[in-house]
């Protein structure tokens, strides 16, 4: 079989187009092999730029790259939730996969709670694949990649990046390293908590209104940071109208990278640039104006007629 034409894949994806089904399968298989080599806590060196949820907002992802720099010029960590809710989950995920395939050391993709079979069947990605390809094969190839995505990244051994937050079952980074991640996200337990939990003004742990994960407070955050010699925890998972929000004496930051979320929230988005572990700079960006994006018709015409 001919080697993958990664340059072609990147070029197609950059135009907000999706790949022929067989090419997508090959790209997904290729990225799965790359992800197999990554640790549950993937080490990353500064300088690096950390990004939050994207949710299929392809044109805003392009704006993110205009704001932060293109791959491979900038080294990126994306903290999950690439798909669902936006119009272009398929094209967004394809673009990120193509970049990962071409420059694996310049882009780290973490798993969010939406990188799951169950959630994508409810919030849009499954239906989008069905509409655009006329079958569910593309969705199946992508969900295999979901299972392989790593859970956390560790910047210069001092900044932990994870989609959701902490777990009462996890005290040390080594406990994250031993999770069996190649599976659908479970309904409870450590793996589930890492992608579902939220920081909140609570004492230690509280029941989450999301029905998965926990609410965790300053005390457990400070303990976790202290035990693991961390400076900061970066996470996404929650809309922040100002784009980012520090909590718990600046031991934790939420980064949100989907501007005007769901095309109606009116929020600003951000990315967090780390020159080194002590030098961080949020970069803010707004949604691309409607005149610069293609709004799909209510019912997309199937690709193969």
From Swiss-Prot:
Active site: 114 (proton donor)
Binding site for Mn(2+) 2: 81, 113, 163, 237
Cofactor(s) it depends on: Mn(2+)
Modified residues annotated as N-acetylmethionine in this record: 1
SMART domains hit by this protein: PP2Ac
Compartments, record wording: Mitochondrion; Cytoplasm
Cofactor note: Binds 2 manganese ions per subunit.
UniProt main location, coarse: mitochondrion
Expression across tissues: Highest levels found in spleen, brain and lung.
A GO molecular-function descriptor: protein serine/threonine phosphatase activity
EC number, UniProt record: 3.1.3.16
One cellular component (GO) term of this entry: cytoplasm
PROSITE patterns the record matches: SER_THR_PHOSPHATASE (PS00125)
Enzyme class per UniProt: hydrolase
Reactions mediated catalytically: O-phospho-L-seryl-[protein] + H2O = L-seryl-[protein] + phosphate; O-phospho-L-threonyl-[protein] + H2O = L-threonyl-[protein] + phosphate
Sites where the protein binds Mn(2+) 1: 53, 55, 81
Keywords, sorted A to Z: Acetylation, Cell cycle, Cytoplasm, Hydrolase, Immunity, Innate immunity, Manganese, Metal-binding, Mitochondrion, Protein phosphatase
Any one biological process term the GO annotation gives: G1/S transition of mitotic cell cycle
Protein function: Catalytic subunit of protein phosphatase 6 (PP6). PP6 is a component of a signaling pathway regulating cell cycle progression in response to IL2 receptor stimulation. N-terminal domain restricts G1 to S phase progression in cancer cells, in part through control of cyclin D1. During mitosis, regulates spindle positioning. Down-regulates MAP3K7 kinase activation of the IL1 signaling pathway by dephosphorylation of MAP3K7. Also participates in the innate immune defense against viruses by desphosphorylating RIGI, an essential step that triggers RIG-I-mediated signaling activation.
Subunit structure: Protein phosphatase 6 (PP6) holoenzyme is proposed to be a heterotrimeric complex formed by the catalytic subunit, a SAPS domain-containing subunit (PP6R) and an ankyrin repeat-domain containing regulatory subunit (ARS). Interacts with subunits PPP6R1, PPP6R2 and PPP6R3. Interacts with subunit ANKRD28. Interacts with IGBP1. Interacts with MAP3K7. Interacts with NFKBIE. Interacts with TRIM14 and WRNIP1; these interactions positively regulate the RIG-I signaling pathway.
Protein family (similarity comment): Belongs to the PPP phosphatase family. PP-6 (PP-V) subfamily.
Record-given protein name: Serine/threonine-protein phosphatase 6 catalytic subunit
Organism: Rattus norvegicus
